[in-house]
């Protein structure tokens, strides 16, 4: 199955973590980049388009600034990123030029993808670069981004970029062999999981947390990234990037890492954008009856099923939909503001106009704007 799936891949996103990209001194490892460039050149020669999502700017800047530890404050991180980004791209240019490949730097913030027009512009730029045979190297714009516009980590960014460029595969190169049944660093009985059909809550709970001393993402963020892409019908593989030609071997179908199979029913591009790209502005808590109707029958969310409103949001905002236990199970675009929802919650749709003095529609969230997670 793995080989057959990979034969169909014509465009792939490769995410490279700081723990893979950096050497023992904390700076960018030129030998790794040379090996990566050779493998990307091989894939390009076979007709596969490659988009790289690369960490490493902060790590490169930290080395240049002589910082002993990973920067902790936002100004320190932004200063390190400002110094390190040019060094990172210079290292990519030097490595890839040896194989007659050109690279292009793309810096993104979450707002670039949350805004639909800027999303389309970014996609157009990337499509043009790929058509010209240029390898895009994408990173978060750490020098200017603030917390509310952050992707969170480059694992999440790589999942959103996969949707942005309509790639058929996401490859996450990390410093561990893949997803294990338990943390292999602490449990000698942990075994590698070669294939995952569905990302369950049990898998998410067992994924653990923190990243390395040079990166921000642990296995939990990689699992979350895989979950995002499989919901749009795209496969993902998490594998160790430091092995011998592992990128080429994975693309040839060798049994390395953990393969996440695409979901049977995939989200369309718009619903994927709603579910994973827009940052939620608030939450709506529904009762058990509404949860069942939404989950099992794919209906719209009516005001009668709403128990509580959390946060302040305007009409047209993305909101989380929580069950009575506070567990998020859906996201959607609301047709009413938080103040309006607060007034009409628990009431029938026929009462909306009498309460508010106007009526946008019967639904607080229409089913076309609602995504089950």
UniProtKB/Swiss-Prot annotation:
Protein name (record): Glutamate 5-kinase
Pathway annotation from the record: Amino-acid biosynthesis; L-proline biosynthesis; L-glutamate 5-semialdehyde from L-glutamate: step 1/2
GO biological process, one term: L-proline biosynthetic process
Cross-referenced Gene3D superfamilies: Acetylglutamate kinase-like, PUA domain
PUA domain residues: 281-359
One cellular component (GO) term of this entry: cytosol
GO MF annotation terms: ATP binding; glutamate 5-kinase activity; RNA binding
Subcellular location: Cytoplasm
Keywords: Amino-acid biosynthesis, ATP-binding, Cytoplasm, Kinase, Nucleotide-binding, Proline biosynthesis, Transferase
InterPro entries: AceGlu_kinase-like_sf, Asp/Glu/Uridylate_kinase, G5K_ProB, Glu/AcGlu_kinase, Glu_5kinase, Glu_5kinase/COase_Synthase, Glutamate_5-kinase_CS, PUA
Enzyme class: transferase
Transmembrane segments: none
Main location: cytoplasm
